Structure formats: C-alpha cells, structure tokens
Regions:
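Bacterial N-terminal signal peptides
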Residues: 8-20
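Metal-dependent amide/peptide-bond hydrolase catalytic core
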Residues: 24-25, 211, 227-471, 475, ...
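N-terminal capping segment at the start of a domain
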Residues: 25-59, 66
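A non-catalytic alpha/beta surface segment that caps or lines the substrate-entry region
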Residues: 44, 54-102, 125-128, 422
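Sec-exported extracytoplasmic/periplasmic mature domains
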Residues: 46, 50-54, 73-77, 159, ...
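Solvent-exposed loop/turn segments at secondary-structure junctions
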Residues: 54-56, 86, 99, 110-114, ...
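Active-site metal-coordination/substrate-binding segment of hydrolases
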Residues: 101-176, 479
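Histidine/acidic-residue-rich, glycine-tolerant segments that coordinate divalent metal ions
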Residues: 166-248
C-alpha cells in the first residue's frame, strides 16, 4: 500500500475511534470499564468490605470513614468529615462544575448491622468470599448489599466517566452516613449544621434492594418507623409451675394474648384508629403500582410460605399501608435451658411501619391506648412493688424516640422525571414505586437539606440484608455502576 494512503487510512481510523469514544453514553462507558477491570474491582470491593462497620466498634467505623475520604481525594474530589459529638462521622465530598444549573446529592451509608460470626458460612462476616450460586456469582460479607455496594458503585462510576472523557454537567455532593443502621439519631443535626454544604435540587438515596423481579427500581418514598417495647409482669421471681400453675398469672401467656388480639386472622390491625389519616395515593402513583410486576407467588415459593396476610391484596398494595410487626419475644427459656417455671416477665419489641399522613408519636399512642383498654396499667419505667400489687395487670411500655415519619416525593415533579429518564437510559425496564417497604430517615434529609428525596437502589432483593450471609450479586454491582454513571451525568 502506498505510504501516503496507509497514513490516511490510519488517520481516518483514529478519527472514527475518537468519534466513537466521544459518542459513548455514560452507561456504555461504565459497562466497558467494569468489563475490563472486573477482577481488580472485586478485589477493591473486598477490601472495603473487610473493615468492620458495626455500631459497637467506633474505631473501625472511623477507619471506614477515613478510607472513604481518601478514596474521594484520590479522585481529586474535595472531601472532609462532618462530625458531631458521640456520633460516627458523615463522609462528605463535593464537585463544583462551572456553569452548572443543578446540584445533585448522592446519599449512602457505610455502617452495617451487628453480626454473629457463628451464623455465617465460614464464620467471618468481614472476609469477603465470592461464591457461584445457580450460575450467578455473589460476594458474601456484611454490607455487601446494604450499603457499601452503593458507595463503591458511585466511586467506580466516577472512574468510568473520567476514563471515557465524559465531563460532569451538574454540581455533585456525596453524603455517606455512619449510623443509618442505628436509626440515624444524629443525621438531622449534622446536616442542619452544614446546610449550605448538603443542600441540593434532589437527594438520590442509594440504599435498599431493587424489585424482586430483578428490574431496576426508582422509589419515591419510604415508610416511617416507630418502635415500642412492651414488658408485662407476673411474680417477682420465677415460680415452680407445678406448685403455682393455674394460680400465679403467667406473663408469657398474658403477653401472647395481648399481642394476638392486635390483629385479625388476615393480619389486619385491630388497634382502634390504626389506619386513620392515611394520605391517598395520587393517580400517577396508582398507575405506577398497576404497572409494577406482581411477584407474590415467586416470593411465596422463595420463602416457603403456605399462606400470606392481606386478605388477597398484593404485597405492593400492602406496603402502602401501615403495619404492626413483632420483632421479637422474650420470656423464660427454651430448648435444653427450659425449666418448669412461671417466668416473672415477658417482653416484646413492636415495629410500627408508617405511611404518609400518620405521625409516629400518634401511632405509638394508639397502641398504648389499646394496651390500656385491655385492662393494663401502663408505666414508662420499671414498676415498684406497690404498683404491681395495686393493679392486676401492669405493662411497662418504652417509646423509641429515634422514630420518624414516612415521606413521599411526587412522581411528576420535573426533577423526578429527569431522574426517571436517566435511570431508563441505563436500565431500560424500570419499576416505579410510590413507597418502599423499608424505612429510611428521608424526612430528616428533606428538612435539614431543604430538598426532595428519590431512592435508587441497586442490591438484589435476596441479599440477606440485616441477616447472616449477606451478599450481593456481582451483576447487580456492574448494573449499579451503569445506573450511577447515568445519574452522575445528569445536568
């Protein structure tokens, strides 16, 4: 070939290559980046997962925060720790883009639920292990799905965009919390003290699982959460069940009867006024629910359930109603430690999930009023002998003051439509939901940062969130990087 012609062909090839690279969409850039670096990325993610992150270990929580600040700075992002006495630090990073019209805030959390190593396969929750399950690769470790995956996906998406030469178009903020699993008791105070830093046009809350169908999900609200701890009393100390059975009241039985009367056979709560005040869904929200996949039968098979509550209503409908759940019961002993005894006390922890229109304090009070209506004298501290002997039934009810209300962002806001289009550019089929089943302190975020919140999760629904053998499908991680790249590219 003529040297001049060869040179011209090379020039044309390079020009076309440059055009192709320039035409790359953010999700395409993320896909190519993760495909080229998968082994390295899994190793890096494993390193992040190796640092313990439970509330009882503040030194390691600080290690997590310091590492994340370093990761942001390594990418040229101005970052710092936002601190409050007695609370884990919030990791904050910001990118300002000249001429940008909007500011987008990405929220995630780096803390995790407590662990019991003996319940984990291999016995080590902080040693990440990749296993193949039904031809899918999953990485197992505490916070693999909830919520270090979101942080790692954001960092990786930033790397992918930089590698592809795709310039950012909006101001970006990163807010990564360290006590979400403890109920975020200090988040609002930290954000309020730094309002000028954390304000944005929208907060993208990157937490939770995608739809059970596996489709990417965008959620516009979250249930609120309130807790009550109920203790009922019998004898001052355990009594021999043969000598005193049929005579001494058994608090375990008393509590079981009290709790059983709170619901009917279909699971509907019978506490008076429990459903009062619910703000109805809008027309667009009802339409979104009607289009969402119905996964009930699949979930029944996955969870080995022979029946479900709800009187025939689908799970997605029931998520938009308040609920009453028993988190745990405690009285006496079972198994090899069981004794023939009438226990002195019985305790239950109640979890009240809330929807928009119901205040958490009012919902707690409705349950307390119901307990009174069943003949109990209610106290908020350990009762003395006089109280126990003056009243036939005594219940100590402790309110969790770290509770919070539900929040819902309208789906038809301009910023909401922009988020939907960005996510669709990465994932095509997207499930839109008015409310997620879980609870996130969105109200604290919206009040303190004076903003709106939209949740974009990336974890698989069966990630064993909050339990032993927590895991993340690696494909969810790669898909999540593409989704984050699309959101980081918003203008």
């Amino acid at each position: 070939m003529n040297p001049g012609l060869r040179l011209a062909c090379v020039a044309v090839f390079l020009f076309c290559l440059a055009i192709a690279i320039a035409a790359q969409t953010p999700p395409q850039a993320a896909h190519e980046y993760t495909a080229a670096h998968r082994a390295e990325l899994v190793q890096q993610f494993s390193g992040l997962l190796s640092i313990p992150n439970v509330a009882a270990d503040p030194a390691n929580l600080q290690r997590n925060a310091d590492l994340l600040v370093a990761e942001l700075r390594k990418r040229g992002i101005d970052s710092r720790l936002l601190s409050f006495p007695g609370a884990p630090s919030v990791v904050f990073g910001h990118i300002d883009v000249p001429g940008a019209q909007h500011t987008i805030v990405f929220y995630a959390h780096y803390d995790g639920q407590p662990v019991t190593p003996s319940e984990w396969d291999g016995g080590s929750p902080f040693t990440a292990v990749v296993r193949e399950i039904n031809t899918e690769q999953r990485i197992y470790a505490r916070s693999a799905g909830d919520d270090k995956a979101a942080i790692f996906a954001q960092l990786t998406a930033l790397d992918a965009l930089k590698t592809a030469g795709i310039a950012l178009r909006a101001n970006l903020r990163f807010v990564w919390e360290g006590e979400e699993e403890a109920g975020s008791p200090h988040l609002e105070q930290i954000l309020s003290a730094n309002r000028e830093l954390v304000h944005g046009d929208v907060w993208l809350v990157c937490d939770g699982p995608v739809d059970q169908s596996g489709q990417q999900t965008v959620v516009f609200g979250a249930r609120g959460d309130a807790h009550l701890e109920i203790t009922v009393y019998g004898p001052h100390h355990g009594l021999h069940s043969g000598h005193y059975g049929n005579w001494a009241p058994n608090p375990a039985m008393m509590l079981a009867q009290l709790l059983a009367d709170m619901k009917d056979i279909d699971g509907r709560v019978l506490v008076p006024h429990f459903y009062d005040g619910i703000e109805p869904l809008s027309g667009s929200e009802k339409e979104a629910l009607a289009r969402a996949p119905v996964n009930d039968r699949m979930l029944m098979n996955a969870f080995w359930l022979g029946h479900v509550d709800g009187a025939g209503a689908h799970l997605l409908e029931l998520i938009n109603q308040p609920s009453l759940n028993i988190n745990g019961l405690s009285s006496g002993q079972t198994g090899a430690r069981a004794t023939n005894v009438i226990p002195p006390t019985a305790t239950a922890d109640l979890d009240l999930r809330l929807v928009v229109g119901i205040d958490w304090r009012e919902q707690q009070q409705r349950v307390i009023d119901y307990i009174r209506s069943r003949g109990y004298f209610v106290v908020d501290h350990e009762p003395a002998q006089q109280i126990l002997q003056e009243h036939p039934r005594v219940a100590m009810v402790l309110r969790d003051e770290a509770s919070y209300n539900a929040v819902r962002t309208p789906m038809d806001l301009p910023i909401a439509r922009e988020v939907i289009e960005a996510v669709k550019s990465a994932r095509k089929d997207v499930v839109l939901l008015p409310t997620m089943g879980g609870s996130v302190p969105l109200g604290a975020m919206e009040r303190a940062a004076q903003t709106r919140t939209i949740t974009v999760p990336i974890a698989n629904y069966d990630d064993n969130q909050h339990a032993a053998n927590e895991n993340l499908r690696l494909q969810n991680l790669w898909d999540g990087v593409e989704t984050m790249a699309a959101l980081l590219d918003m203008k």
